[in-house]
Amino acid sequence: LLLALLAAAGGDVLLTRPCAAWYAPLARLAGSPAFHVPVPAECGGVPDPFALLETVRRIRAEGGRPRVLLLSAADDPTGTLAPPEILHEVCEAAVAERMTVISDETWRDARHHPGGSVFLGPAEMWPEHVVVLTDLAGALIPTAWPAAVARFPAAGRGPALRARATEALAAVRAELPPPVAAAAAYALA
């Protein structure tokens, strides 16, 4: 699903450093150059807002087209949860630069620091600019049964992006087998 989203969005992809191991290879497979942006000291999964803006400026100066910011507020590699204020600054910068934010929320329901931050996703702040992606195998169905879900914005670029991603998935016959579809429907109910 992430591959279809990246192919549908086109342009350059900005990733955090560190990020999930499969992000950069999928961007390359989609034909999108991937650029890494360092994370702030207090968390992973989201880029430092100032480093993001500097990276976007540099990519554009070199003739690139930064179109997608892929982040994970509940970060797998670092095991951290991005504070809402940093996440807001990052999303505000990405929206100002006309980028689509893909928020990988596979681990949003995992237990984080008790008494610490409550998960606040980018789509709750900027619903018209964020595609929410989750892999149900992360927490809801057996890992051998691949099933992912994406929630697209209802307005703006959302409908066109959804249509292009759906076309890409249909072209490769990315269909859920009936038992997986039933498990996914149950998990999402």
Show the residue positions of the predicted features:
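Phosphate-binding glycine-rich loop
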Residues: L1-D12
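Short hydrophobic alpha-helical segments of the AMP-binding
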Residues: L6, Y23-A27
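A short helix->loop->beta-strand "cap" motif at the edges of active sites that frequently abuts
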Residues: G11, S32, A96-M99, P127-E128
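Short beta-strand->loop structural element characteristic of the AMP-binding/adenylate-forming
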Residues: P33-E42
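Active-site phosphate-binding strand-loop segment of PLP-dependent enzymes
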Residues: A41-G116
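Conserved core segment of the aminotransferase class I/II
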Residues: E124-A189
